[in-house]
């Protein structure tokens, strides 16, 4: 008997303007695939509504109540299956830490579903989220034009909104994305094919999700393992834990940790004696593997969360305090304006370090990436910009063109994500 090949796992995020129906679309996908969160089903049973049918509207009301009480039902990390994919919905941007989570790799999205209401068309947040998806390196986008029931399933209106979205996404460099007319509330074209729109012959939303290309593993890039934790295990020694972002690690190879080696002015390195994943020994770890690995001659106090392991032949790139790096950022949320001298905290992979804005080189049009102003005095919410940043402590960062997983970052201050960005290049100071 042949075992079916394991289906690829794909992470998706839902983006789009507030009130365009992200939650309803997620709710409909889960409802129609039989994956409503456990606590909602429990609640239904507790309320003794046995006789009544478990209606979609009721489910959405419960989800909304939970949200208003400040509990986002973990639609974050809700899983469902399509014929060829295991799909995890990793987040929807109502979540405060959406951007931070996406950048720090708590949840690397393979694709985004951009929800646009047929009634409103493209709105400011539609543009911002689309630009953000690109900044975060999301390669595939599926467009769901929702609320078709509110425009009487009118083809002309669909074509108008489709044209707006296509213009926006093409400017951002996206090609070949499906644009699907849906009504999440009525359940049209989400999981079940709609008979209300005979003029549309493309895929349903779930069919489009089933066709998301399988994420490729960057095994040919240099090894990079951002460290999440370090354990000291009796009889074994020091065991750093982290997810392999790029490259591969084999037992017997020598790894070096940065910025630890830079900070201690001596190589913090050693031979890998063993690798474990889910308590099983591994000879070789690949991108996406969450591993613990035992390193000879490295003590628990030498390394910490935020360090990155790489091979001694191609060590992780350290940006020191005398260095700077050039970055492209999008300001998502700042109460006033950002000027030179602003010093928030940079979050990249598992590291967090204070940084200082040294220069504001240019303000960009978020849609086209074209420069609209050289050396602006300040930048504010909604602006995209090229800036020079200086870390106040050494940190591992890589240019996004070389190792994207270590080239993206979030900027946080006052408990919020202020900006998202990517490293363009690193300038060495003397």
Swiss-Prot record:
Residues 16-23 are annotated as: G1. SUPFAM superfamilies: EF-Tu/eEF-1alpha/eIF2-gamma C-terminal domain, P-loop containing nucleoside triphosphate hydrolases, Translation proteins. Residues 146-149 are annotated as: G4. Residues 183-185 are annotated as: G5. GO terms for cellular component: cytoplasm. It is an enzyme of class 3 (hydrolase). Keywords: Cytoplasm, Elongation factor, GTP-binding, Hydrolase, Magnesium, Metal-binding, Nucleotide-binding, Protein biosynthesis. Residues 91-94 are annotated as: G3. The keyword Ligase does not apply. It catalyses: GTP + H2O = GDP + phosphate + H(+). Mg(2+) binds at residue 23. Its EC number is 3.6.5.3. GO terms for molecular function: GTP binding; GTPase activity; translation elongation factor activity. It is found in: Cytoplasm. Belongs to the TRAFAC class translation factor GTPase superfamily. Classic translation factor GTPase family. EF-Tu/EF-1A subfamily. PANTHER family: TRANSLATION FACTOR (PTHR23115). GTP hydrolase that promotes the GTP-dependent binding of aminoacyl-tRNA to the A-site of ribosomes during protein biosynthesis. This is Elongation factor 1-alpha. It comes from Pyrococcus woesei.
